[in-house]
């Protein structure tokens, strides 16, 4: 249900009439639509992860020890920071969260490459790779989310300067 609501929010913000009714500029509405699109893509990956875990619960004990699962709390922390900054728009905090997400992405990429080195674990390799890719994509979409927030802040500052 939440997934459908997020998609509808994105569609609403892409409408110029909706922007007018919400008393936001067309540019702001497009940025909010971009935020909604990032959330929508993250939900796709979370849905994939959930489906995988439900269908392959025999892997759960081993998965808890893998870097992708261990990195999820750091991703959640960074995304939470970005979500809080929808309102506060603290550039330094947004950029710190984006840097943490980039570090997580890099570490997960290294992990994914290391999986291929041990061919004995083909089945575990496939599941670990799938989960790692989803967590890495969650980090990427969260970084995009942060970039949109920075763009929104910059537009707001530029509008203030212009209106003086």
Cite the ranges covered by each PLM segment:
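Cytosolic, long alpha-helical scaffolding segments
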Residues: 1-164
């Amino acid at each position: 249900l939440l997934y459908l609501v997020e998609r509808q929010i994105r569609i609403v913000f892409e409408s110029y009439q909706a922007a007018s009714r919400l008393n936001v500029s067309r540019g702001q509405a497009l940025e909010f639509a971009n935020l909604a699109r990032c959330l929508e893509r993250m939900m796709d990956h979370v849905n994939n992860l959930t489906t995988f875990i439900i269908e392959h619960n025999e892997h759960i004990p081993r998965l808890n020890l893998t870097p992708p699962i261990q990195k999820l709390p750091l991703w959640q922390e960074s995304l939470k920071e970005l979500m809080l900054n929808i309102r506060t728009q603290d550039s330094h905090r947004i950029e710190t969260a984006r840097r943490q997400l980039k570090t997580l992405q890099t570490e997960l990429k290294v992990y994914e490459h290391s999986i291929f080195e041990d061919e004995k674990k083909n089945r575990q390799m496939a599941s670990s790779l799938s989960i790692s890719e989803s967590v890495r994509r969650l980090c990427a979409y969260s970084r995009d989310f942060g970039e949109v927030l920075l763009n929104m802040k910059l537009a707001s500052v530029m509008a203030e300067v212009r209106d003086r």
